[in-house]
Amino acid sequence: ARTSIRFRRGHMGKTISQDPTFITPKNYDTNNTVIKITNRAPKLKTLNLPINIKNVLFLTDIHIPYQDDLALNKAITYGLEKNVDCIWLNGDIMDMYGASDHEKLPDHAMIHEEFDAMHDFLGQLRKLFPKAQIYYKEGNHERRWTRLLMRKAQELIGMKEFELNIILKLEEFKIHWVANETHVKF
């Protein structure tokens, strides 16, 4: 339906598709609409990356502590060779298996072990790229932490000590946290 409406309004392609009677039918009173939605979704926050960034190493879906070490080391080596000045961690950097809704297997890492592995990774990343700006965009696996709190301990939501960026000590590693709802302009 949306595509058809966009076509009729002339908002698609280069063909002449505008139908003036469709856009504004005769005797149409804009004040007497059938549906009027006043509450809209909030606008996303926008993050504009600094214009001085030249080379970005883009890492995504690492799923620590279940990472592919060979692939991760190749990507890091590539970033070192290219002398990147920015690293973009695009979500699902940690797996958060322990916080998932899935039935837990006994041989998988516990949440505290996943946090330890993340601290280790972020510390090594900062040492390897001491001058790079690092951004960590929240992914759906990181959101598992919030969902776990919502299911098991709603009272803790909003307390700084239980926010994922605080637990991961991102400030200590000089890593910028980018919330899931943020629109990013490169």
Model feature map: region roles:
Residues 1-58:
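Acidic, histidine-bearing metal-coordination/catalytic regions of metal-dependent phosphoesterases
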Residues 7, 22, 125, 153, ...:
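Extended hydrophobic/Leu-rich segments
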Residues 13-16, 146-147, 185-186:
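Short, solvent-exposed polar/charged micro-motifs at secondary-structure junctions
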Residues 39-41, 69-70, 175:
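Short gly/ser/thr-rich secondary-structure transition/capping motifs
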Residues 46-51, 96, 154-155, 180-181:
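A broad, low-specificity signal for short, low-complexity segments enriched in glycine/proline
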Residues 55, 133, 174-176:
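Conserved beta-strand segments of alpha/beta enzyme cores
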Residues 59, 64-171:
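Core catalytic region of metal-dependent phosphoesterases/phosphodiesterases
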Residues 167-185:
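Short acidic low-complexity segments
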